[in-house]
């Protein structure tokens, strides 16, 4: 039994980046032996084991054979006789097919180091075209390593995948995961478009309002919600197809619904009802969503407008009915609240204008 560090950790280190995680491949072992050493088995498709101390993933060396459609249409062989080179041969790109033994010696049968030096994204073998997920991974790596070039032979393999209709067998969840992993969803879509594979994102048409220009690119929720808001016409349908979490969908919908009206709003003496209507649509009860909404908006350079709305919302939050009003019928209570909100809005606008 021998273990090797493989894949992204080595690639990133050779590129001068700090590896985010480490993955290992185990040669000459079996599920029984791994479990006897305290490893915990996970994964349904093939044996992956979690190290009892580090929590890092260890996968048995394997080969694979195409047996169906999509990224899951493979049969795996994890026999103890599978070699390291055979395992590396099934990987997607040469830069991801480098291993390191316990002595720090690199095993690089497909010249991944040379492609890193020459800034090339190149498939390892003809098996690349059997897995449609690799098109999305290729786009993601091109976004991350923007100064790398996809070699023509690999683009030919992408064309083979597209023409085979294998992309149609990718699940929405897998498409979402690759988009989530990408450093920039706009560039991710752009790379897929260059490859002729952007249909896999299920984006029906591009909107052109250009409202959300400067999301915080270090905040996935802000960045992806802005992308959905900016690029997708039917947000609910798109998020349903890709199984996108509700917090992304909800923030994108709120951006769609309220960002333009806030941007267009100008505080003047008789605009108090417009102010109230805008704030109602924000649904200030959903505090986390509201916080993210204003963070996105502030990042677009609108701090003054954000301060104006947030301070008004704080006043609404602090408003309390008098004890005598609480005893009134519901329809009367509603009228009291609406009247009080109008007074608060008028006073807030007046205070703002006095300070200008």
Q: What kind of region is each of these model predictions?
A:
Residues 1-356:
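Catalytic cores of the polymerase beta-like nucleotidyltransferase superfamily
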């Amino acid at each position: 039994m021998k273990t090797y560090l493989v894949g992204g950790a080595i690639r990133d280190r050779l590129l001068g980046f700090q590896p985010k995680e480490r993955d290992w491949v185990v040669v000459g072992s079996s599920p029984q032996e791994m479990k006897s050493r305290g490893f915990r088995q996970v994964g349904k498709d093939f044996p992956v084991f979690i190290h009892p101390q580090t929590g890092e993933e260890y996968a048995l060396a394997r080969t694979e054979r195409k047996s169906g459609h999509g990224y899951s249409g493979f049969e795996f062989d994890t026999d103890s006789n599978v070699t390291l080179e055979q395992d590396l041969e099934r990987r997607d790109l040469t830069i991801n097919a480098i291993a390191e033994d316990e002595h720090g010696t690199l095993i690089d049968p497909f010249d991944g180091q040379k492609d890193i030096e020459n800034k090339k994204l190149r498939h390892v073998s003809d098996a690349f075209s059997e897995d449609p997920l690799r098109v999305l991974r290729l786009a993601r790596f091109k976004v991350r390593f923007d100064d790398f070039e996809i070699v023509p032979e690999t683009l030919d393999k992408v064309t083979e995948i597209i023409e085979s209709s294998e992309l149609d067998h990718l699940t929405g969840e897998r498409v979402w995961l690759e988009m989530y992993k990408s450093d920039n969803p706009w560039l991710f879509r752009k790379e897929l478009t260059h490859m002729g594979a952007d249909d896999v994102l299920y984006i029906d048409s591009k909107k052109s309002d250009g409202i959300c220009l400067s999301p915080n690119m270090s905040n996935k929720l802000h960045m992806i919600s802005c992308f959905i808001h900016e690029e997708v016409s039917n947000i609910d349908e798109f998020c349903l197809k890709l199984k996108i979490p509700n917090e992304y969908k909800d923030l994108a919908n709120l951006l769609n619904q309220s960002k333009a009206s806030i941007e267009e709003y100008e505080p003047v003496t008789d605009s108090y009802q417009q102010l109230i209507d805008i704030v109602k649509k924000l649904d200030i009860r959903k505090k986390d969503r509201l916080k993210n909404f204003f963070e996105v908006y502030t990042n677009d350079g609108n701090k003054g407008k954000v301060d104006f709305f947030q301070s008004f919302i704080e006043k609404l939050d602090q408003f309390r009915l008098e004890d005598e009003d609480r005893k009134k019928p519901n329809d009367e209570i509603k009228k009291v609240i609406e009247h009080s909100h109008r007074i608060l809005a008028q006073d807030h606008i007046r205070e703002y204008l006095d300070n200008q």
